[in-house]
Regions:
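Residues located in well-ordered beta-strands
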Residues: 2, 14-19, 31, 62-64, ...
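Glycine-rich beta-strand-centered segment in the early N-terminal region that forms part
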Residues: 21-35, 46-96, 101, 147-149
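Mid-domain Rossmann-like dinucleotide-binding core that forms the NAD(H)/NADP(H) cofactor-binding site
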Residues: 80-81, 141-142, 147-232, 236, ...
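NAD(P)H dinucleotide-binding glycine-rich loop of Rossmann-like/cofactor-binding domains
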Residues: 91-184
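C-terminal hydrophobic helical "lid"/dimerization subdomain
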Residues: 261-265, 269, 310-359
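Glycine-centered, small-residue-biased loops immediately flanking beta-strands
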Residues: 271-272, 297
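Rossmann-fold NAD(P)-binding glycine/threonine-rich loop
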Residues: 278-296, 313
Length: 359
């Protein structure tokens, strides 16, 4: 099969013919229909988080099940599935507490990649998916069956960008109606945090970004206010918008140190900062612990929106079908696999909400 292989950090991906092993017990092979370009893929491919090469990235996908291994019960050949990176056993401590994103179990696919080059060289199945390729082999816990009626490019976003942003609001923070919410970063994840806040009934939803274009886009997704952090005093504007109280919730959806450092100063008393974006290895953020303790403020981490994919993805699809969740509008442009480096470059320039590779 064809795949876009990363052989050197920070360099263009290389289109190669690679070999994919047959699915084993509890696994399946999925023919990828669409896979989105996520900033996490770019950060990994740039070497921001280390890792081993060669590797195939891509983790935000949808496709058709073509083969199943022994014991697979949740899906059948021909099903359309959203493919996520969340691999879970269902019975460890993390899973038992309703947090499959923190599953502690090691799987055969974790120990040995199903991917090899034509010369027999092992290729890392990055982010437990490796969907910058025509096919993937994944564990059955990683997929959710959906209708084939949803556009593939739109459906692929449910695998990461949507559940991460929306879920940070609804699952991790559990934002209450009437809350004042600030979302730092108006990219794909940030826009879905905005949508989560809107659906949750937030009183004000403030989108903060360096791009006026993205701020205007955020308003179409539900933001009530926009602040360009390169032109305005964010803390002052947030105080004005919230009648001098500050924000009940601040969601940091980008990986910039300045975004983390500035977020705590936007909080109201008893307010909560939710860390969603992922900085490069070694980046540290500074807080004022005395103020946070005195004001009963909180910091939460949110991985993949604390998602339970078998519950959350069907719920998100229901909101989409009701017209309460925008998916189609998140897709900026579609590309074929051979154009993947062009798609990545556009994301790096800030020219896209989500670019999607279609097969």
């Amino acid at each position: 099969m064809k795949a876009a292989v990363c052989r050197e950090f920070g360099k263009p991906l290389v289109i190669e013919e690679v070999t994919l092993a047959k699915p084993q017990a509890s696994e399946m092979r999925v023919k990828i229909s669409a896979t989105a370009i996520c900033h996490s893929d770019i950060s990994y491919a740039d070497g921001a988080w280390g890792g081993t090469l060669p590797a195939i990235f891509g983790h935000e996908s949808v496709g058709i099940v073509e083969e199943v291994g022994a014991g697979v019960t949740q899906v059948k050949v021909g099903d359309c599935v959203v493919v996520t990176l969340i691999r879970s056993c269902g019975h460890c401590r993390g899973c038992s507490r309703g947090m499959p994103v923190t599953c502690e179990t090691s799987f055969p696919l974790d120990a040995k990649s199903p991917l090899t080059s034509k010369s027999g060289e092992s290729i890392v199945q990055a982010m437990r998916t490796g969907s910058f390729a025509e096919y993937v082999v994944v564990h059955e816990s990683q997929v959710v069956v959906i209708s084939k009626d949803i556009k593939a490019a739109s459906a692929s976003l449910l695998a990461c960008g949507v559940i991460t942003g929306f879920g940070a609001v609804t699952n991790t923070a559990k934002v209450e109606a009437g809350s004042h919410v600030v979302v730092i970063g108006a990219g794909g994840v940030g826009l879905n945090a905005v949508q989560g806040a809107r659906v949750s009934g937030a009183r004000s939803i403030v989108a903060v970004d360096l791009s006026d274009t993205k701020i205007e886009a955020a308003k179409t997704f539900g933001a009530t206010h926009g602040i360009n952090s390169g032109k305005e005093d964010v803390a002052k504007r947030v105080q004005e918008i919230t009648d001098g109280r500050g924000a009940d919730y601040v969601f940091v959806t980008v990986g910039a140190k300045q975004a983390f450092d500035s977020s705590y100063g936007l909080l109201a008393k008893s307010g909560t900062v939710v860390l969603v974006g992922m900085p490069a290895n070694g980046v540290m953020s500074e807080i004022d612990p005395g103020t946070m303790a005195a004001y009963s403020q909180n910091i939460l981490g949110s991985k993949m929106g604390s998602a339970r994919i078998q519950v959350d993805i069907p719920n998100l699809i229901s909101l989409y079908e009701q017209g309460r969740l925008k998916l189609d509008e998140l897709v900026t442009k579609t590309y074929n696999l051979e154009e993947i480096n062009e798609a990545i470059a556009a994301v790096k320039r800030g020219d896209a909400l989500r670019n999607v590779i279609v097969f």
